[in-house]
Design a protein with these regions (language model features):
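Conserved metal-phosphate-binding beta-hairpin within the catalytic cores
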Residues: 284-320
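Peripheral (often C-terminal) accessory segments that flank ATP-dependent C-N-forming ligase machineries
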Residues: 331-446
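Phosphate-binding site of ATP-dependent enzymes
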Residues: 194-257, 267, 271-278, 298-299, ...
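Conserved hydrophobic helix-helix packing surfaces used for dimerization/oligomerization
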Residues: 13-16, 171
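Glycine-rich phosphate/pyrophosphate-binding beta-alpha loops
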Residues: 181, 254-255, 312-326
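Conserved N-proximal alpha/beta basic substrate-recognition cap immediately N-terminal to
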Residues: 51-155
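ATP-grasp fold ATP-binding core
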Residues: 141, 164-186, 214-228, 245-249
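Conserved beta-strand positions in the Rossmann-like core of class I SAM-dependent methyltransferases
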Residues: 40
Length: 446
């Protein structure tokens, strides 16, 4: 059943989206429109405003991107939270924070706990402890008895050196506030530390020396490495109660070994074991969850046991893909706001949809994969602008060309220039890049 905000039998609800990342905000208008919401967007992303204008002027795009009542554009990113405090939040039935940066800014804002609770996807101050903090999350999960990898907190350089010296098993070293896999490093006891290995992964000593050169901000999280599949169990909660969820396995990632997923294998909820739903309900209470949660865990190869290691208190770009298996978040969210219904398990099989399906995210594929319809990508681009996809492909190719040009300059031009002339060229390049980033037509970043 598809629910729409213009259904005469239902009153529309109102939602406010707040965030810096246009990529993460993009999926919400369509999802919330189907759930019966009229949407306002408060953002510093100029591209969202540009796309919103194009949606309003194009009936096909408007239908595909849902109903956005207004976009409130903030010129300076640092003013986003301040702007949200000047809005009448009582007019909204749902407030959605779109990205980790906005979550951290709200947490750091000099406002009352009550105001933070009005904005953040938690229902009690207990939830503040883990927002934007990998260490805080590990401690909360441990205290609640939720299965999570063993961990220790590294508070200074001395403790970091001691960790490496006494290493007896592979450890994941994580910067406390980081995302996208960029702050995650493997310390593997199987490496010699000399870099001479069949794998590209450097040894523990090399990793530590590299990190010390980056002016690390302590504390760090040292976490047991679990071998197995990465599962996504992203869910929507209200007052700690599970409203809807999805179940998928990472099949491919981008940027780095621990980066965001580009291809996933989704399964109908009817195929999911009851212990997974029990885990999700326990997580809702442990996290004080009151909104979208991006939940990730490891399924250990040897035992099949699940270990939760990530719970970002915002949705991911995959938030609306469960609909391709009949597990539509929009239907469940509308049902909750109309009747208070939560997710009941076990979930009945939906014969109108496949039990499993492989789904890619178009903006994390290469242009060649998109052009050749790898993983049937065009089937899952119903809500995407073809012009936008073409622009992404052009930006991807241009970035690759620039990378080769930079390498050529470093190898073949720099040796022939005086240091002062080389620095002048670099300064000119930075000035051009900064100017381009300030223009309204800022490039889309992967």
């Amino acid at each position: 059943m598809q629910l729409h905000s213009d259904d005469a039998s239902h009153k529309p609800y109102h939602a406010l989206l707040i965030g810096h990342s246009e990529e993460l905000l993009r999926a919400f208008p369509t999802l919330l429109d189907r759930a019966g919401f009229v949407v306002d967007v408060l953002t510093s992303a100029s591209r969202f405003e540009q796309n919103y204008r194009s949606y309003r002027n194009n009936s096909r795009s408007r239908n595909n991107h849902g109903k956005v009542r207004q976009v409130i554009q903030v010129s300076l990113p640092e003013d986003l939270v301040t702007a949200s405090l000047h809005l009448d939040l009582n007019q909204y039935d749902l407030v959605v924070i779109g990205d980790d940066k906005t979550l951290r800014e709200i947490m750091a804002a000099d406002v009352s706990a009550a105001m933070k609770l009005r904005l953040l996807p938690v229902y009690s101050e207990h939830g503040f402890r883990h927002i934007g903090s990998k260490i805080g999350l590990s401690e909360v999960l441990q205290d609640a008895g939720i299965p999570t990898p063993r961990f220790t907190v590294v508070r200074d350089e001395g403790e970091l050196d001691a960790l490496v010296k006494n290493l007896t098993e592979p450890v994941m070293l994580k910067i406390d506030q980081s995302g996208g896999g960029s702050g995650v490093f493997l310390l593997d006891t199987g490496r010699s530390g000399s870099g001479q290995s069949d794998a590209d992964q450097p040894g523990p000593l090399e990793v530590i020396e590299m990190l010390k050169g980056r002016q690390l901000v302590y504390p760090l999280l040292a976490q047991q490495r679990i071998q197995g599949d990465v599962l996504d169990l992203s869910s929507f909660y209200q007052h700690g109660e599970l409203i809807c969820t999805s179940y998928s396995v990472f099949e491919a990632v981008v940027r780095c070994s621990y980066g965001p997923s580009s291809v996933r294998q989704y399964s109908q909820l009817s195929t999911v074991n009851e212990n997974v739903f029990e885990l999700l309900r326990d997580l809702g209470r442990a996290l004080s969850a009151h909104g979208f949660v991006n939940l990730t865990c490891m399924r250990e190869s040897a035992t099949g046991k699940l270990y939760v290691f990530e719970a970002d208190m915002r949705a991911s770009v995959w938030v609306d893909y469960g609909k391709y298996l009949g597990d539509d978040h929009a239907v469940a969210i509308r049902r909750y706001f109309d009747t208070g219904a939560t997710l009941v398990s076990p979930v009945s099989h939906n014969p109108a949809f496949p039990e499993q399906v492989r789904i890619p995210f178009v903006y994390r594929l290469t242009p060649w994969e998109i052009l050749t319809n790898a993983h049937q990508v065009w089937r899952y681009c119903q809500n995407q602008s073809v012009t936008r996809i073409a622009q992404y492909c052009m930006d991807f190719l241009w970035s690759a060309i620039k990378g080769h040009m930079t390498m050529f300059a470093v190898l073949h031009v720099k040796p022939w220039l005086k240091p002062a002339h080389w620095e002048r060229l670099r300064s000119m390049r930075r000035s051009i890049r900064d100017w381009r980033s300030r223009t309204p037509r800022a490039r889309f970043h992967r």
